[in-house]
Amino acid sequence: MRECISIHVGQAGVQIGNACWELYCLEHGIQPDGQMPSDKTIGGGDDSFNTFFSETGAGKHVPRAVFVDLEPTVVDEVRTGTYRQLFHPEQLITGKEDAANNYARGHYTIGKEIVDLVLDRIRKLADLCTGLQGFLIFHSFGGGTGSGFASLLMERLSVDYGKKSKLEFAIYPAPQVSTAVVEPYNSILTTHTTLEHSDCAFMVDNEAIYDICRRNLDIERPTYTNLNRLIGQIVSSITASLRFDGALNVDLTEFQTNLVPYPRIHFPLATYAPVISAEKAYHEQLSVAEITNACFEPANQMVKCDPRHGKYMACCMLYRGDVVPKDVNAAIATIKTKRTIQFVDWCPTGFKVGINYQPPTVVPGGDLAKVQRAVCMLSNTTAIAEAWARLDHKLDLMYAKRAFVHWYVGEGMEEGEFSEAREDLAALEKDYEEVGVDSVEAEAEEGEEY
C-alpha cells in the first residue's frame, strides 16, 4: 500500500484540513463517524482510499492526518465540529500559547516544546502504514506557527524519514490582502529553511483565490470557508490519483519526477477549472477543450503571476470525471498550435496527463456547481519567480529599517539568519532566471570568456 500522511500546521493548515477531509469523506462515501457503508472489506483491505484512511477492526475509517497548532481555539473547532468522531483525539495536538505571528516563536521557543510530541504521533501513524510514501504538509507562509513550526517539523521529518517525499501546500501571503505586517519576514525565513527539505511545494495565493471567488462564483465578500473549499477541490484533484484507481495513476514521487527539473525549482503553479457557480453551469457546456483552455488563463491560477511572461518547464494535466484520452489529446494539440505558451527550449513540449474516472464531488450547500468533468493543471513555470520577487521587495523595505526585527531576535534568533535567508531567496530568483534562458544563448556567452 502507498500511504500518505497529511500534516496540518497552524490555523491556515487546520482550516484547509477541515475542508479537505470533509471533501474526501463525501468523495469516498465515508460518514462523519467514520463508517463507510460501501466498504465490503472490513478492518483492512487494499482499497485505494486506504492511502489516506486507515481502518479499525470495527470498520471505522480514520484519516491518516495530524492537526497541530500552538494555540487551541482552531483545533477545538475540529474537536467539537461535525467530524469530531472521525479523528482520533491524539491526532489533534495543541499547545497553550500561540506563536503570535512570529517565526522565531514557532521555530525556536514555543515550537520546540511540542515538536517531539508531534513526531511521536506521526510515528504512530507511520507504524500503521505498510509502505508509507510520504507526507503532505499544509501550512501558511505568513503565520508564526505555519512558518516557524512547519519548517522545524520538516527539518525533523527529514532526519527521521530521510527518503520519504514531502509535499507542501503553502498559503502564500497575498499581495493586497494581508493578515500580518511581518508576513514577508516569516515567508522568507520559512522558505529558506524548508527549501532543501521540501520535494515539491504547491503555493496558493489568498488574493488569487479571492479573485476567483469574486469573479467566477459571484461571491461579493468571500470568507475563509469559501476560499478553503476551493483550495480543498484543488488538493482533492491533486490527490485523487492517489485515492482512486484511474487510467493513469500518479503517485507522490511521480509528481516530482515530472515537475521538478532541478531540486530547488520545485514550486509548481496550480490552476483549476471549471470554477463556476450553479446558476452559470446550467447554461454552459464545459467540454474538455474548454476546461483545458481555461487552465492557461492567468485568471484561474492559484498564484498571481503571468505565465505569458515566463516559460514552462513542465506541465501536468490531471483530469477527473467524464474524460476520454481522445478529447484530451485533441485539446492539448490545439493548445500547442496556439503558441501563446512558451516552453523552455531544453524541454520538449511535454504534457503529462492523468485521467481519473471519479467525477468531482461538491460539498452540499457550497458555492461550486456539480460538474461532469474538471481539470487541475500543475505547471512548473519561470513566472512564479514574480511571486518571490514581490516578497523579497517587501522584505527589503522593512529590513532596511530593521523594523520588527527585535521580536525575532528576542526569541533567540540571530540577525544573520535574515540576511542568510534573503541571500538564499535572491539565489532562488537567479535560479529561475537562468532556467528560462535559452540554452543556445547561454553556450554562446560561455564561449566568449575563453
Swiss-Prot record:
Binding site residues for Mg(2+): 71
GO biological process, any: mitotic cell cycle
Active site (catalytic residues): 254
Xref: InterPro entries: Alpha_tubulin (IPR002452), Tub_FtsZ_C (IPR008280), Tubulin (IPR000217), Tubulin/FtsZ-like_C (IPR037103), Tubulin/FtsZ_2-layer-sand-dom (IPR018316), Tubulin/FtsZ_GTPase_sf (IPR036525), Tubulin_C (IPR023123), Tubulin_CS (IPR017975)
Domain of life: Eukaryota
Keywords attached to this entry: Acetylation, Cytoplasm, Cytoskeleton, GTP-binding, Hydrolase, Magnesium, Metal-binding, Methylation, Microtubule, Nitration, Nucleotide-binding, Phosphoprotein
Catalytic activity reported: GTP + H2O = GDP + phosphate + H(+)
Gene3D superfamilies assigned to the protein according to its UniProt record, in alphabetical order: Helix hairpin bin, Tubulin/FtsZ, C-terminal domain, Tubulin/FtsZ, GTPase domain
SMART domains per record: Tubulin, Tubulin_C
Modified residues (Phosphoserine): 48, 439
Pfam family, one: Tubulin
Modified residues (Phosphotyrosine): 432
Biological function: Tubulin is the major constituent of microtubules, a cylinder consisting of laterally associated linear protofilaments composed of alpha- and beta-tubulin heterodimers. Microtubules grow by the addition of GTP-tubulin dimers to the microtubule end, where a stabilizing cap forms. Below the cap, tubulin dimers are in GDP-bound state, owing to GTPase activity of alpha-tubulin.
Protein name: Tubulin alpha-3 chain
UniProt organism field: Bos taurus (Bovine)
